[in-house]
Amino acid sequence: MDATQITLVRESGHICAASIYTSWTQSGQLTQNGLSVLYYLLCKNSCGKYVPKFAEITVQQEDLCRYSRHGGSVSAATFASICRAASSAALDAWPLEPLGNADTWRCLHGTALATLRRVLGFKSFYSPVTFETDTNTGLLLKTIPDEHALNNDNTPSTGVLRANFPVAIDVSAVSACNAHTQGTSLAYARLTALKSNGDTQQQTPLDVEVITPKAYIRRKYKSTFSPPIEREGQTSDLFNLEERRLVLSGNRAIVVRVLLPCYFDCLTTDSTVTSSLSILATYRLWYAAAFGKPGVVRPIFAYLGPELNPKGEDRDYFCTVGFPGWTTLRTQTPAVESIRTATEMYMETDGLWPVTGIQAFHYLAPWGQHPPLPPRVQDLIGQIPQDTGHADATVNWDAGRISTVFKQPVQLQDRWMAKFDFSAFFPTIYCAMFPMHFRLGKIVLARMRRGMGCLKPALVSFFGGLRHILPSIYKAIIFIANEISLCVEQTALEQGFAICTYIKDGFWGIFTDLHTRNVCSDQARCSALNLAATCERAVTGLLRIQLGLNFTPAMEPVLRVEGVYTHAFTWCTTGSWLWNLQTNTPPDLVGVPWRSQAARDLKERLSGLLCTATKIRERIQENCIWDHVLYDIWAGQVVEAARKTYVDFFEHVFDRRYTPVYWSLQEQNSETKAIPASYLTYGHMQDKDYKPRQIIMVRNPNPHGPPTVVYWELLPSCACIPPIDCAAHLKPLIHTFVTIINHLLDAHNDFSSPSLKFTDDPLASYNFLFL
């Protein structure tokens, strides 16, 4: 066939998913040609029918690890080698080739998809396009965005997958991995043992159920590769095998085979019901059935998930590179809202978040190599060492401004106060410098309007990741953020508003001329909104005029009014309590522990106590001048109210002294260590150990010994857990409570006489409740 002959056929539709089918390098020209990749695209035409399409692209060597957090370079030959290993293993092998080099696979997945998008020309999955396919080669050459399509709001068609595969894995191998890595997740340890040693139980049953809008199947197997012992529904109602003959570069002809779904392009799985291993067992069975018959090039089958990270990850997801070609989404619950959240994240990021982590939005960018900083920003940053007026803002605030005007605990009243926060602040600055990144800009714009809450962690991850991936861009954003803080501070001061505390993307302060006796809450809020608008204009002017940035009006920074307040109490830069007595709305209390439900309950009571203290002073001071006599009366009543508060709290927690979830804390990374061997006998519980662990402290049999940490979520519900050491959990909480009350007593003491001290030791008095 003459490779120069092209016969195009055009078809309207959209792309639902894209996955690498196979990859290779051109012999003898590795550096020049990069990595050749054959993509399988699951598409839906304008008639609503799913169609398979294939595209060949070349990922240049310099792009392969461009946004890798760990730097360095992996050759195209290495990528081709790992792909070959993932498509040539035994049919019953587990798809765990990425185990041990998951970052390399994430780079491959992200960079290849980014290249595919740029080469073909589509904007995103589910956006309407016109496909141009060469009938001579069978390859998709181009996708032309269809801005005038009648149906421009395509969404995923979801089905539900439920599976149960209680696989037994050699406990000694899991234990060895756990001990060797000093704190690895047990899910990682189990996968490592599974990859090395396989199943220890040859007759592991598998129960699978798939529900789609128009089909239902259920299969029950006594063992994975034996005929089903229970059968319901036809697999042909779910998907069909499709083969295509393709002609690749170099006039090389191959035959490919895919499972083409009939009525879905996403399968959702409830993570509380179906483990990742159960999904993999199901897909492994289908892979063996689909490719047991020779005559075609087998696709890659490789798993990427949080279990592949030795320390686990904060988020749950499921991704396979290659087979099966459709998307598998993890949901927190089977509820419709949870499914909607998962599909929204998938659509807005083409499935790259959270799979590729901090690199996700870099792979969604319209460029390969990141563009340089805008010239004026670069020039200003270069002047920092000589410009001493700005040195502190960039040196002392190297992660963003954190400052307060107070050197000691302070209480404020009589004047209206307000708290402000920039929406999606740091990503907004990035988009102001690089407005061509439309995918990121769309999400940032939605966050400004309080939309796409599910992608807030993605934006936080993106900005934090810049420090590792593009440190010069990160420093520039911090520089601009600090300049904005100075601009806002000056603008606010000119409007009669003094900023008290500024923390990165938000601040609170006091209106110097708005007296709470003369101005109502609605009027104060109007003043706050006017101030926000004035600051927004000043910041926009800074970005456009002084920094020379050119961005659309829709992306201008938004300063949100968090609330207006009549009273404030602050004891440190990050610790404050703000309350509106006129409206009696819930106070804004920050800077106290909240890691457990017990901590959150005490925080709520502390916030209420601070409201009570305010009301006591308002009552005592009414029509009087605040003096040391009134202070002593007030302080005595506050101390008494504090006693009632902690007694009420102890009564509350006493009823929950046997409830692990109430006391449970998330283990900090610095605390992570190897799990005791006693946890290794519950395999089905270990599969869930890929997130930060929840711990409780239980009493030591030795009354003089420290409490023992128990990973209670890794134990079955029938496990007998020793008595919870409630006192150990309460000690830091009560310490914070007592400290803040004493700061409050100091803050209200405007006199030379010593402050009354809250000297109670609540735990010493009530420890008997928890013995």
Curated annotation (Swiss-Prot):
Q: Which residues form a coiled coil?
A: none
Give a yes or no for keyword Transferase in this entry. yes
- Write down any Gene Ontology CC term: host cell nucleus
- GO BP annotations listed: DNA replication; viral genome replication
**What's the chief localization of this chain?**
host cell
Domain of life per record: Viruses
Q: Which Pfam families match?
A: Herpes_HEPA
Cite the entry's keywords alphabetically: DNA replication, Host nucleus, Transferase
Briefly state the protein's biological role: Component of the helicase/primase complex. Unwinds the DNA at the replication forks and generates single-stranded DNA for both leading and lagging strand synthesis. The primase synthesizes short RNA primers on the lagging strand that the polymerase presumably elongates using dNTPs. The primase-associated factor has no known catalytic activity in the complex and may serve to facilitate the formation of the replisome by directly interacting with the origin-binding protein and the polymerase.
* Xref: HAMAP family: HSV_HEPA (MF_04010)
On subunit structure and binding partners, the annotation says:
Associates with the primase and the helicase to form the helicase-primase complex. Interacts with the origin-binding protein. Interacts with the polymerase catalytic subunit.
Under what name is this protein listed?
Answer: DNA helicase/primase complex-associated protein
